[in-house]
Amino acid sequence: MKIAVVGTGYVGLVTGTCFAETGNTVICVDINEEKVKKLQNGIIPIYEPGLEVLFERNIKQERLKFTTNLQEGIKDAKIIFLALPTPPGEDGSADLQYILKVASDLGHLLENYTVIVDKSTVPVGTAELVHNNIKKHAKVDFDVVSNPEFLREGVAVEDFMKPDRVVIGTSSEKAKKVMEQLYNPFIRQGNPLIFMTERSAEMTKYAANAFLATKITFMNEIANLCEKVGANVDDIRRGIGTDTRIGKRFLFAGIGYGGSCFPKDVQALAKTSKDHKYDFQILDAVMQVNHQQKTRLIEPLKAFFNGDLKGKQIAMWGLAFKPYTDDIREAPALENIQVLLEMGAKVRVYDPEAMENVKQIFGEKIEYADSPYGALLNSDVLMIITEWPVFRTPDFEVAGKLLKNKVIFDGRNLYEPSDMTELGFVYHSIGR
């Protein structure tokens, strides 16, 4: 099948590459000439495990191509995916200008019946707006379908190739058959294609992310209370996670969520609620608690230094919002670095993938180590912000000698408190 993907960001690139892997001919379109040139030369602008192998294979076999020309990219395409950014406005609403502009352009360019698919995360009712923008100019039949992505950064290729489910919003039987044909290779193990209306599909995406953000936030609140009452949040997690009604995932306490999805989508759903005069109180609480949780380690850090961090050297392990990605959007590390700098501290950081992205924000205001141990050298204390595997079993004897004080502030609960005490460390974690 001939497929066009408009937008070569995270979602667009994974979508295009994975569809090419199942034998489709895919052309990805982007207005960024420099980005397209790099992609044509085999350079991927994001870090995502497993993507590079598929990308190189499908470029070599000429199933995956890139262009800046929309007309060229969509020619003879049976399906056109819109994987465009929907950045939040100041009021939390999703900015649809890119999607609606492309929709208008498509109206002028469509030559045959085509299925237009919203892959971006968009507010309820967007499929209708896209349909109307295309219809103003189109001379052929078309359908607009909502097909939200449920990719997790770090395991996006696996999520795409072996989905838990595929949600498709359409009221057209013709479009339904096209989408069934497209996704058939991905659901051979029995995971469902779930058909619903376009509005329900758009709402499903927001509901899923808001629920997961709420689950994370609830456990962080439990962790904070555990510290007050002398309980251990790890015990609580095991105690409730074995209840099949609750499940084991997204129960790890820490210093909050970040990334390109949860913060933006919770905010957008809250804005949708306000627009419809519904007071979605849980979402407001989730956003407030998560904002506070990101800098949860600052208070015990200040207490250790008697309130004065001026001139103190802080080592920081982890910058990306989660492991296995270089994405720093809404990452807790950013807020912690900013607060530490404002308090007069010096910061030296290490992350396996995200340091170049952080350098674009902080430049020379902080130091960048070439290894985890390099960050520790002559630092007063260590803060752990992201749970990269490389941080899970360090040589604590070496770490203790490099640090001025054997003190760790762990925002991801990587180590057992009793083990750290035995090793002679002062160890602060979350909810334990």
Regions found by a protein language model. Name each.
Residues M1-R432:
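Structural/interface elements that position substrates and couple domains in central-metabolism enzymes
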